[in-house]
Regions:
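A short beta-strand-loop structural module common to alpha/beta enzyme folds
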Residues: 102-112, 247
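N-terminal beta-loop-helix "entrance" segment that forms/cooperates
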Residues: 108-129
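Bacterial N-terminal signal peptides
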Residues: 8-15
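Boundary at the C-terminal end of the N-terminal hydrophobic targeting segment
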Residues: 18-20, 25-26
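Positively charged n-region of N-terminal signal peptides that target proteins for export
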Residues: 1-4
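Glycine-rich phosphate/pyrophosphate-binding loop and the adjoining helix
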Residues: 42, 46-57, 61-63, 217-283
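Helix-loop-strand module that forms the ligand-binding subsite of alpha/beta enzymes
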Residues: 130-224
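N-terminal beta1-alpha1 ligand-phosphate binding loop
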Residues: 57-101, 241, 267
């Protein structure tokens, strides 16, 4: 709850409404056309649909007992197999697979993950009391094995969407992700890295993190991403992990752009470069 309030306060200071005209430019056609004439177009949200012929996949290895580094993707997108967010996830998964890492992709909608903290499981999630719920045990086992946890979701309300946030709250429970000590709370996921991949449609200001603006309102872009960094640092630190940053795609190819394929390929190249920087060069 405190993370949501903090993020809301930080982002509200950016006067997002001032940029409303730009906010839809990435995913909304600039001219009207009958729906029957437009295929695979999502003109209402920033989670754009990728034309079927341009979609990619990743053959996740799952986790073994080998000493290979392990990356856990936690994906909260109901259209993962079609969306631009899904394209980013699969691009990132293939990036790590090529480096010999083991990859596990948890499609939260596909596995029908229940994000709701109920009165019955509240005290386990918040206080670590009682038995770990059966649906949480396999998720905690994956988190325990992972060297990196990457949260992936479309930007709908400037925070993790409900299913992703619920995963954080239920899986990263007390006595698993953190505990009380005489000196205060202690994170228990030391040595792990946390990262976020988020598709957006706000300013059209950049691809990446702070400093990755494209010359369009860079100061606002950096302030926007700086607000996320405050929350990401706090969340990772709460668990004892390290925040490795986030990749925000705020340059979604317009669905009707005649150069859509080239822009999509460029987006994949930019994501690869940002991952190389954030996971390997910045160590």
């Amino acid at each position: 709850m405190k993370h949501n309030l903090l993020l809301a306060a930080l982002l509200s200071s950016l006067s997002v409404g001032c940029y409303a005209a730009d906010a839809v430019s990435g995913a909304t056609p600039n001219h009207a056309a009958p729906g029957s004439q437009i295929k695979n177009v999502d003109a209402a949200t920033s989670a754009s649909i990728v034309p079927q012929k341009l979609r990619i996949s990743a053959k996740a290895t799952g986790f073994t007992d080998s000493k290979a580094k392990k990356v856990l993707f936690v994906v909260g997108d109901p259209r993962f197999d079609q969306s631009l967010e899904g394209f980013l996830v699969n691009t990132a998964a293939n990036f790590f697979l090529k480096k010999g890492y083991e990859v596990e992709i948890r499609d939260l909608y596909k596995i029908r993950f229940n994000p709701v903290i109920t009165p019955e499981n509240f005290y386990h999630a918040k206080d670590g009391f009682g038995q770990t719920p059966d649906d949480i045990k396999p998720e905690q086992a994956l988190v325990s094995k992972a060297d990196y946890i990457i949260f992936c979701y479309p930007n709908w309300h400037d925070s993790p969407n409900a299913i992703t946030k619920g995963y954080m709250e239920r899986v990263f429970s007390k006595k698993f992700a953190y505990q009380d000590t005489p000196k205060g709370l202690e994170g228990l996921l030391k040595g792990k890295g946390i990262y976020t991949i988020m598709n957006a449609g706000w300013l059209g200001g950049g691809q990446g993190n702070v400093g990755d603006g494209i010359g369009k309102l860079d100061a606002v872009w950096d302030k926007y991403l700086g607000a996320y960094k405050v929350v990401d640092d706090d969340t990772a630190g709460f668990w004892g992990a390290k925040n490795l940053g986030r990749f925000v795609n705020d340059q979604s190819p317009s669905n009707l752009n005649p150069q859509y394929q080239q822009k999509l390929q460029k987006l994949a190249s930019v994501l690869d470069a940002r991952l190389e920087r954030d996971f390997f060069r910045n160590k």
